């Protein structure tokens, strides 16, 4: 069964830390982390060592803030 995972963190190594929140609909928490590392690393050109995870939590469909993920969940 799929879970909705919210990852909060920051990217270090730049002039000032960039704070982010990402939400993923995945089967395992590890899948969400791997996708987040891949996306953030390619978009911001940082290595995984510079991405600091602050919080990883499972959330309900009502708590989703990402509009694209919200629309996707409404379809099913």
From Swiss-Prot:
Disulfide bonds: none annotated. InterPro entries: Ribosomal_eL20, Ribosomal_eL20_dom. Pfam families: Ribosomal_L18A (PF01775). GO terms for cellular component: ribonucleoprotein complex; ribosome. GO terms for biological process: translation. Belongs to the eukaryotic ribosomal protein eL20 family. Keywords: Ribonucleoprotein, Ribosomal protein, RNA-binding, rRNA-binding. The lineage of its organism: Archaea, Methanobacteriati, Methanobacteriota, Methanomada group, Methanococci. Signal peptide: none annotated. GO terms for molecular function: large ribosomal subunit rRNA binding; structural constituent of ribosome. Part of the 50S ribosomal subunit. Binds 23S rRNA. This is Large ribosomal subunit protein eL20. It comes from Methanococcus maripaludis (strain C7 / ATCC BAA-1331). It comes from the Archaea. SUPFAM superfamilies: RplX-like (SSF160374). The keyword Ribonucleoprotein applies.
């Amino acid at each position: 069964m799929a879970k909705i995972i919210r990852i909060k963190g920051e990217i270090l190594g730049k002039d000032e830390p960039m704070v982010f929140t990402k939400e993923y609909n995945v089967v395992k928490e590890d899948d969400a982390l791997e996708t987040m590392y891949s996306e953030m690393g390619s978009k911001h050109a940082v290595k995984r060592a510079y991405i600091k995870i602050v919080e990883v939590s499972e959330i309900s469909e009502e708590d989703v803030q990402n509009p694209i993920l919200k629309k996707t969940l409404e379809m099913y």
